[in-house]
């Protein structure tokens, strides 16, 4: 049996059903189909503008939405299954966060970007943006994986999605920065938000659960499923909301080449940093993806294919170095217990991506972009800014993202420390049997091991 504090029989149904009821009410009051998904509105447009059904944005955006959706539910979910006793929770809590997050983010982002005549108008692009927002929360989830209850994760999602919407609106609409692939708004914000939450929730006696924090052979194979899905679909992630035509085409190409170069750099550095020249599966699962993060801001810009490769190579190197040397320092010196190493996959590569975006913006000229300047840098195109000013605003956007992450993560961390949310004890972390019915007698055996603080690897 589980302890009283971690028993979810009342807490989880209360929070899930109450928040779902509130969300339904808010959708009923505010959310409506946009003109491309509304029966009357779309057919009026067909009649008035000589359009055809093939012009509906659904047919342009849905393939990208499918890919992003797979990344959110399969890619992120399975990437976190490396923990040997936490596979159920990794996949299923990812599922829970995403299911609630996409609904709540539809409301929050709708108020900022799709609010007209007192209503939020949603379409295919709204769904993509909702998934993007959810992605930031899942990145934060990686930092606290195994150390939080499902109720804590729901509360974190509720607040973080709200802060994400405000942060994104300030960066894109007030600062006027470009960040189609989310190096700043998604990866940097999500990573440092999660790291600060983890710092506030620091566990003095986590050593009692360290024996379950590692992986086994089959759990690493499951995690590689997530890696491969993320790697294949990352070009869609970065290009999903860019302008049709050359912008989307260019973003896919830049991400494609950055990921490829990043993968080679990851394999090379992983072997180089091992005394016996062996590869570390943690590096391959994670650092090989950093190339997608590194071109999130600059992907739609004229980065050039070789520039994308340079970005990917740098990201792979930085990420591997982070896993090898920086993660232990964060734990021992700064008391930041980063379960998935999100600082190395999302945090540092996100900052790198923001810096690359600012540098590329600095060299934006009419000779390079021609008439395409209006799509990529509209404020430069209309004369509101120079390229140098746009570059400085790109740096400012990075500071805004970091500020929201640090302040928001601190506030949420202290909220989650309240004892009412069913958090596991230091000896119960990274264990499915605390919250799940585990098949056979394995669950009862593992609970006994946890309660007695024994090493499960020594059990018969």
From Swiss-Prot:
Family annotation (Pfam families): Ammonium_transp
GO cellular component: basolateral plasma membrane; cytoplasmic vesicle membrane; plasma membrane
GO function terms (MF aspect): ammonium channel activity
Example GO biological process: ammonium transmembrane transport
Cytoplasmic compartment residues: 1-10, 84-87, 147-150, 203-220, 274-283, 327-347, 416-460
Membrane topology note: Multi-pass membrane protein
Domain of life: Eukaryota
Keywords carried by this UniProt record: Ammonia transport, Cell membrane, Cytoplasmic vesicle, Glycoprotein, Membrane, Transmembrane, Transmembrane helix, Transport
Name of this chain's protein: Ammonium transporter Rh type B-B
Source taxonomy: Eukaryota, Metazoa, Chordata, Craniata, Vertebrata
